[in-house]
């Protein structure tokens, strides 16, 4: 279940600043203004990296949620609370 591709608007402020810094560093390294193709490839690489990080975080959260999920006690012979509806009798 892959997460949908994020846009710059959906990035946090920190991520947007980091992307701007990457673009500035590339511009300085080239010694000229970047072309649209160069800019887009840098953005695409950064967004791909973010997507991998977010997917890993989501996977870790799912595993933690699954681990902490309620497990019924196999020792108990009968659970009244499981068999009584919350609305009561009508």
Swiss-Prot record:
Pfam families per the UniProt record, alphabetical: DUF3811
Extent of Polar residues compositional bias: 78-90
Annotated region (Disordered), positions in chain: 62-90
NCBIfam families listed in its UniProt record: PRK10515.1
Protein name: Uncharacterized protein YjbD
Lineage, top ranks: Bacteria, Pseudomonadati, Pseudomonadota, Gammaproteobacteria, Enterobacterales
Gene name in the database record: yjbD
